[in-house]
């Protein structure tokens, strides 16, 4: 579902402190520093907000503003550049 929504073949999704990969090898994911930084930011967000509260906030943001303008995604994209 995430791959279709993002129009991407390869997807990484964080739940708690685990990064779940779809159609990408662990090696290729780890070699992409921007993608890794993005997902590590989501791990930090889960830690800061708590597991269930983060999911609720993330879903609410996505419903209100869409995926691209979701503040958690904006923050994760900014983390890619650090």
Language-model segment annotations:
Residues 1-21, 49-82:
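Metalloprotease/metallohydrolase-associated module, dominated by Zn2+-dependent proteases
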Residues 34-46, 76:
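Active-site recognition of the HExxH zinc-binding catalytic motif
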């Amino acid at each position: 579902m995430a791959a279709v929504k993002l129009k991407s073949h390869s997807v990484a999704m964080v739940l708690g402190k685990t990064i779940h990969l779809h159609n990408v090898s662990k090696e290729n994911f780890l070699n992409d520093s921007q993608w890794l930084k993005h997902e590590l930011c989501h791990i930090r967000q889960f830690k800061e907000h708590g597991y269930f509260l983060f999911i609720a906030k993330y879903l609410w943001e996505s419903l209100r503003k869409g995926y691209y303008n979701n503040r958690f995604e904006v923050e994760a994209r900014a983390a890619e550049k650090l």
